[in-house]
C-alpha cells in the first residue's frame, strides 16, 4: 500500500507538471500572438516606408539610404518570423512528447491498480476460505477467529484504501483530461498563430517584390549618379584648369598694372620736367 501511495503521489506530481506545462503553453501562445501583431505592425511600417521611397525618388542619396535600411529591416523581420515558426514547431513537439509520457504513466498506473485489485480479491478469497473451514480445536478456533477478525480488518482497510486509491485515480484522470484539453487549446492557438505568420510571410514576399522594383529604379538612378559624378569630375577638372588660367591672367594683370604705375610715374616725372622747363622759359 505504501508503494501505491508513493505512485499516486508521483502521479499527482506529474499531473501538476502537466498543468504547469499547459499554462506555460498558453503564456507562450499569448506571447506569440503579441509577436505576430508586432510583426504585422512592422509590415505596415515597411509599406509606408516603401511608399515614401516611391514618392521621394528624386532625392537619390536619401532613397538609397532608406532602401538599404528597409532591406535590413526586412531581413530581420524575416529572420524573426522564421525563428518564431521554428520555436512554435519545437513547442508543439514538446507538448506531443509530454502528452505521450502522460499517457504512458496513466497506462502504468492503471496496470498497478489492477494488480492491487487482484491482491484485494485474493485477500477476500482467503477470508472466505477461513470462514468456511471446519475447526475442531477450540483454542485453534479462537486463534483462527482472531486471525479471521484481523484478516477482515485488513480486508476492510484494503477495501477502504482501494476505494481511496480509485477515487484519487479518478481525480488524477480528470485532472489529466483537463490538462490535455488545455494542451489541445494551446495547440489550436499555435496553429492559428502559424496561419498568421504565414500571412505575414506572404506580406513580406509582396514587400520583397516591391523592394525589387525599387532596387531596379535605384540601379537606374545609380547609373545616372555615376554619369553625373563623371560630369562633375570633368567640370571640376575644367574648373581647376580655368582657375589656373585665371591665376595666370591675374598675374599678367598685376604685371601690367605694375608697368602702368611705372609708366604713370615716368609720365609724371616727364610732365614735371616739362612744367619746370616751361616755367624757366617763361621767366626769361
Curated annotation (Swiss-Prot):
Q: Where is this region: Disordered?
A: 1-41
Keyword terms:
Coiled coil, Repeat
Q: Does the keyword NADP apply?
A: no
Basic and acidic residues composition bias: which ranges? 12-41
Q: Which Pfam families match?
A: Tropomyosin
Q: Which InterPro entries match?
A: Tropomyosin
User: Where in this chain does the entry annotate a coiled-coil region?
Assistant: 1-284
The domain of life is Eukaryota
Read off the domain note.
The molecule is in a coiled coil structure that is formed by 2 polypeptide chains. The sequence exhibits a prominent seven-residues periodicity.
Give the PANTHER family listed for this entry.
TROPOMYOSIN
The record's similarity note reads:
Belongs to the tropomyosin family.
Kindly state the subunit structure of this protein.
Answer: Homodimer.
Q: What does this protein do?
A: Tropomyosin, in association with the troponin complex, plays a central role in the calcium dependent regulation of muscle contraction.
Any idea what this protein is called? Tropomyosin
Amino acid at each position: 500500500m505504501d508503494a501505491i501511495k508513493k505512485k499516486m503521489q508521483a502521479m499527482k506530481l506529474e499531473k501538476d507538471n502537466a498543468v504547469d506545462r499547459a499554462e506555460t503553453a498558453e503564456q507562450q501562445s499569448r506571447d506569440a500572438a503579441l509577436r505576430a501583431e508586432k510583426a504585422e505592425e512592422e509590415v505596415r511600417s515597411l509599406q509606408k516606408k516603401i511608399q515614401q521611397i516611391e514618392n521621394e525618388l528624386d532625392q537619390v542619396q536619401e532613397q538609397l539610404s532608406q532602401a538599404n535600411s528597409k532591406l535590413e529591416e526586412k531581413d530581420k523581420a524575416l529572420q524573426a518570423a522564421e525563428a518564431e515558426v521554428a520555436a512554435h514547431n519545437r513547442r508543439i513537439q514538446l507538448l506531443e512528447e509530454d502528452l505521450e509520457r502522460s499517457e504512458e504513466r496513466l497506462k502504468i498506473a492503471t496496470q498497478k491498480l489492477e494488480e492491487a485489485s487482484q491482491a484485494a480479491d485474493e485477500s477476500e478469497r482467503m477470508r472466505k476460505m477461513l470462514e468456511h473451514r471446519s475447526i475442531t480445536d477450540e483454542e485453534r478456533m479462537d486463534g483462527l477467529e482472531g486471525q479471521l477478525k484481523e484478516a477482515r480488518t485488513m480486508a476492510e482497510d484494503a477495501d477502504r484504501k482501494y476505494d481511496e486509491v480509485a477515487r484519487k485515480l479518478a481525480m488524477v484522470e480528470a485532472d489529466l483530461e483537463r490538462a490535455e484539453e488545455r494542451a489541445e487549446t494551446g495547440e489550436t492557438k499555435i496553429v492559428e498563430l502559424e496561419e498568421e505568420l504565414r500571412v505575414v510571410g506572404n506580406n513580406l514576399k509582396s514587400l520583397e517584390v516591391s523592394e525589387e522594383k525599387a532596387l531596379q529604379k535605384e540601379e537606374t538612378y545609380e547609373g545616372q549618379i555615376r554619369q553625373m559624378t563623371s560630369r562633375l569630375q570633368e567640370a571640376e577638372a575644367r574648373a581647376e584648369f580655368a582657375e589656373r588660367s585665371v591665376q595666370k591672367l591675374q598675374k599678367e594683370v598685376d604685371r601690367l598694372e605694375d608697368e602702368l604705375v611705372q609708366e604713370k610715374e615716368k609720365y609724371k616725372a616727364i610732365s614735371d620736367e616739362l612744367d619746370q622747363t616751361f616755367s624757366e622759359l617763361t621767366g626769361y
